[in-house]
Amino acid sequence: MSISRRIATLGLGLAASFGVSLAAQAQARELTVASSATYAPFAFENKDKQIVGFDIDIINAIAKQQNFKIKVVNTPWSGIFAALNNGDVDLVISGVTINDKRRQSYDFSAPYFAAHQLIAVAKGSTVASLKDLTGKKIAVVNASTADDVASREFGKTNANIRRFESTPLIISELAGGGVDAAIGDNGVIAYRVSQNAALKTVEDPSFPEEGFGIVVKKGDKALQDKLNAGLAAVRADGSYGEIYKKWFAKEYKGR
């Protein structure tokens, strides 16, 4: 064999070895996922202190389809976007509503859940709509969509709007009589109210439909595209419907 052929063969061998190494690294890449585990049934800790829920199953299904690994980190809602900004996590999945304000700072996947706001009140309450809460004490999660809704309707500095750091806290405040109503995303409010016979939910048709999205850093198109491809695939193969039925005990009829 000539020297030139030996060099060429050696070069091909090194290239192949390098390619296999890169492929292995890509396959082994682990993405860190922030989720606030106070948001049942989307994300919460089970009795074994594992973070489980609809959001967790969805991101796991996407990761499996797109051949990457994930590590879920329980992150308080108040610090969840800072964790993404600082590079402590690669993405956020935590029932985050896609809206124009957030789009200015972050990029989102396609919507993975259709939601709307829902009011929780005591069983004997006569509240039938958002407007009926005028002059009443309202609990919301700080910096949430419900906070935006209440602030627009009643004024951001209205002393009757009580802000808390998690959904369990607003429901606890309502159950204890500290407020007249709590507002939040329908999935989590309905779940919490179903566990307390003294409470009920109130639907207001004026609440628009919202979409939950997976959040990535602004400009991270590669990860955004990967998430969208995975989400489309789990919808197409039926995995999404199975996960939805597992957590909401009914067939998926939405988008």
Describe the function of each predicted region.
Residues 121-138:
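Flexible hinge/capping segments at coil-to-helix
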Residues 35-39, 73-78, 87-99, 123, ...:
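Beta->alpha turn/N-cap motifs
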Residues 68-69, 85-94, 136-137, 166, ...:
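Alpha-to-beta junction loops
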Residues 45, 59-68, 146-164, 193-197, ...:
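Ligand-binding cleft/hinge of the Venus flytrap
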Residues 37, 113-121, 190-232, 250-255:
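Periplasmic-binding protein-like
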Residues 79-82, 96-104, 149-152, 175-176, ...:
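A ligand-binding cleft/hinge motif common to bilobed small-molecule-binding domains
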Residues 26-95, 237:
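Extracytoplasmic small-molecule ligand-binding "clamshell" domains
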Residues 56, 72-82, 125, 162-176, ...:
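Short helix-initiation/N-cap motifs at beta->coil->alpha
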